[in-house]
């Protein structure tokens, strides 16, 4: 864990300016993976060169795929699924939950042996939700806690299609099963309890694969091949979220965000902001590769408390840390529930959000499935820690902009996982 400490101070004036947020992390991962599995050359622009997505590139290079990456441009020379070769060493996913879970789906259908590892945080995250259904499909997967924890050993091969009902909504699990189903005999169908982000389905379609959706059931026929496609990655709404919240709560602010992804399965934060009374406008909307994008402007707003629950949770699961910061600045009680999934992110985000914001004087309490925030009380300075979780780190930086006193943030290095230019962009608005 990066021990670097940064001293943060209250914003002296309103935030003002224009930011092009980095490429969407979810889409960047998938563009590289699908390009590596496809026949032909895939060109990716707008790629997020953060640590997580670079882990995906490294893993596929180890399986013999030629990938060139310079800044936000990536070229992948795919030779089809059969072009993937048995790796010589272990596949290290670093801190990336997306990489490991989707990779397990790919590896399950490949006729070779592989071992997947990650960092300490990955070593604590549950993998049985992916490995159990993949085993049902015929993959041989072993690991600590009977395949629940890394390192994981996968001996793939001919898998069979299944009909699987997911107990917990997870786009990563859904995607892993669809990628395994692509290689299986027959039609695999996955039913989710709540609709989750659908980047995998949209991008498979762009790569020439037929995926059908009926209600909350997604089906894929095995034996289809991917054809290379060029991918233009929109800006990541999860990264934009930090500046959307900052623009709302720092007095005298007006912030423009360009080229932000507006996929409805990810845009829950926009609905919450509108509901709460934010001065938010969205324009210049276009769609490329099945992914909508647009420009947005946010200014300081008088906001009302809000409730987040049920079907809305998967559409903003990664934005809850910064929405909790927003809630501390709104008079009244904000409630977040049905968000148990936060417990299995890079940290237990219920505990870390509540624990760290409480250190800054927030009136906030954890519940079994979320949190209750009684806002409107000024935040104070204090010592806080990202716990190696990029989204916690950035949320605490936004909190510091409103704190009456300096905030000392430990483990800032984690932020580079998804937003390497975060501090540079924040500085440009001040």
Curated annotation (Swiss-Prot):
One of its GO terms (cellular component) is cytoplasm. One of its GO terms (biological process) is amino acid biosynthetic process. Pathway: Metabolic intermediate biosynthesis; chorismate biosynthesis; chorismate from D-erythrose 4-phosphate and phosphoenolpyruvate: step 6/7. One of its GO terms (molecular function) is 3-phosphoshikimate 1-carboxyvinyltransferase activity. Phosphoenolpyruvate binds at residues 25, 97, 125, 172, 349, 391. It catalyses: 3-phosphoshikimate + phosphoenolpyruvate = 5-O-(1-carboxyvinyl)-3-phosphoshikimate + phosphate. 3-phosphoshikimate binds at residues 25-26, 30, 170, 172, 318, 345. SUPFAM superfamilies: EPT/RTPC-like. Signal peptide: none annotated. It is found in: Cytoplasm. Gene3D superfamilies: Enolpyruvate transferase domain. The active site is at 318 (proton acceptor). The keyword Transferase applies. CDD domains: EPSP_synthase (cd01556). Its EC number is 2.5.1.19. It is an enzyme of class 2 (transferase). Catalyzes the transfer of the enolpyruvyl moiety of phosphoenolpyruvate (PEP) to the 5-hydroxyl of shikimate-3-phosphate (S3P) to produce enolpyruvyl shikimate-3-phosphate and inorganic phosphate. Monomer. NCBIfam families: aroA. This is 3-phosphoshikimate 1-carboxyvinyltransferase. The gene is aroA.
């Amino acid at each position: 864990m990066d021990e670097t400490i940064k001293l943060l101070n209250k914003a002296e004036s309103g935030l003002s300016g224009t930011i092009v947020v980095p490429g969407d992390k979810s889409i960047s991962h998938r563009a590289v993976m699908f390009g590596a599995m496809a026949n032909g050359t895939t060109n990716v622009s707008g790629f997020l060169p953060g640590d997580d997505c670079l882990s995906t590139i490294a893993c596929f290079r180890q399986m013999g795929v030629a990938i060139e990456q310079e800044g936000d441009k990536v070229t992948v020379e795919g030779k089809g699924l059969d072009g993937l070769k048995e790796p010589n060493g272990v596949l290290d996913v670093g801190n990336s939950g997306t990489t490991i879970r989707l990779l397990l789906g790919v590896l399950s259908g490949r006729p070779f042996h592989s071992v997947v590892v990650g960092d300490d945080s990955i070593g604590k995250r549950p993998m049985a939700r992916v490995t159990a259904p993949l085993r049902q499909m015929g993959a041989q997967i072993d690991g600590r806690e009977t395949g629940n924890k890394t390192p994981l050993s996968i001996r793939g091969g001919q898998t069979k299609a299944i009909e699987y009902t997911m107990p917990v909504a997870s786009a990563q699990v859904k995607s892993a099963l669809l990628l395994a189903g692509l290689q299986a005999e027959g039609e695999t169908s996955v039913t989710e309890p709540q609709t989750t982000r659908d980047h995998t389905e949209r991008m498979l379609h762009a790569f020439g694969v037929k995926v059908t959706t009926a209600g909350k059931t997604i089906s894929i026929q095995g034996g289809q091949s991917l054809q290379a496609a060029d991918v233009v990655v929109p800006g990541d709404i999860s990264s934009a979220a930090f500046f959307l919240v900052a623009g709302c709560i720092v007095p005298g602010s007006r912030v423009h965000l360009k080229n932000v992804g507006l996929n409805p399965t990810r845009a829950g934060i926009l609905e919450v902001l509108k509901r709460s009374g934010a001065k938010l406008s969205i324009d210049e909307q276009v769609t490329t590769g099945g992914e909508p994008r647009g420009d947005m402007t946010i200014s300081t707003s008088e906001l009302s408390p809000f409730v987040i629950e049920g079907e809305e949770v998967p559409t903003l699961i990664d934005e809850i840390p910064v929405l909790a910061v927003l809630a501390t600045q709104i008079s009244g009680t904000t409630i977040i529930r049905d968000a148990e999934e936060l417990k299995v992110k890079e940290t237990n985000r219920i505990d870390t959000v509540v624990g760290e914001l409480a250190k800054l004087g927030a009136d906030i309490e954890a519940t079994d499935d979320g949190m209750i925030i009684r806002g409107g009380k000024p935040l104070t300075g204090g010592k806080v820690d990202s716990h190696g979780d990029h989204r916690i780190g950035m949320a605490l930086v936004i909190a510091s902009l409103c704190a009456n006193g300096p905030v000392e943030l430990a483990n800032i290095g984690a932020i580079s996982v998804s937003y390497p230019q975060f501090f540079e962009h924040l500085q440009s608005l001040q």
